[in-house]
A protein has these predicted regions:
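A short glycine-rich, Lys/Arg-flanked "PGG" loop and its adjoining helix->strand segment in the class I
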Residues: 131-146
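Class I SAM-dependent methyltransferase SAM/SAH-binding core
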Residues: 49-51, 55-107
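A short, aliphatic-rich alpha-helical micro-motif
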Residues: 42-43, 112, 134
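A short acidic, Gly/Pro-enriched loop at the edge of an enzyme's catalytic core
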Residues: 109-118
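Conserved class I S-adenosyl-L-methionine
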Residues: 1-43, 57-61, 82, 146-177
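Nucleotide donor/acceptor-binding cores
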Residues: 45-47
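Short catalytic micro-motifs in class I SAM-dependent methyltransferases
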Residues: 122-125
């Protein structure tokens, strides 16, 4: 279904990203997650799709809020493996989630449809043809469905220097914290 590869599947990059996301005072934890959750409708009994679901953190939050089922897509095999592992730990969720390795540009190939809510957290900046993605999202949503997404402001990553960049052994910038 997919011939693209993800930078997150590189061992060092994935390890650095996991470290970054485990920070309890990160932008994701103190701003983005609470804001995203506040914008969502009541999730009880709803079917949700999370585009660029990463390690499944948002999927777990949706299931904890009584979503009937959640579907996550991501390009990264490593991210999806971690999501599967973490969601399986919560035994009561095991039959209520599905994960697909699929780039957002191929959303039309996702076999599932008729979602009440579609979300995406800090992932749309990877998309070249955003209008085409919005058409595919509209085709996957139920009538009057909801799209909620977050997007990094370019100012957060425009500075080339500074201590906020995670760097690999070659001193290349790989993630911003």
């Amino acid at each position: 279904m997919n011939n693209k590869t993800s930078v997150y599947d590189k061992e060092n990059f994935f390890a650095l990203y996991q470290k970054l996301r485990s920070n309890p005072i990160s932008l994701n934890e103190i701003v983005e997650k609470p804001t995203m959750l506040s914008l969502l409708p009541d999730l009880q009994g709803k079917k949700l799709l999370d585009l660029g679901c990463g390690m499944g953190g948002h999927l777990q939050l949706y299931l904890e809020r009584d979503a009937a089922s959640v579907v996550g897509t991501d390009l990264s095999v490593k991210m999806l493996e971690q999501a599967e592992k973490d969601l399986q730990k919560c035994g009561q969720f095991s039959s209520r989630f599905s994960l697909y390795q699929l780039p957002m540009e191929k959303l039309s190939e996702l076999p599932e449809r008729d979602f009440d809510v579609i979300t995406s957290s800090f992932a749309f900046h990877y998309i070249e043809d955003f209008p085409a993605l919005l058409v595919m999202i509209a085709n996957k949503l139920k009538p009057n469905g909801t799209l909620v997404f977050s997007q990094e402001h370019p100012i957060t990553t425009c500075h080339k220097e500074g201590e906020r960049w995670e760097k690999n052994e070659q001193k290349q910038q790989v993630a911003y914290r």
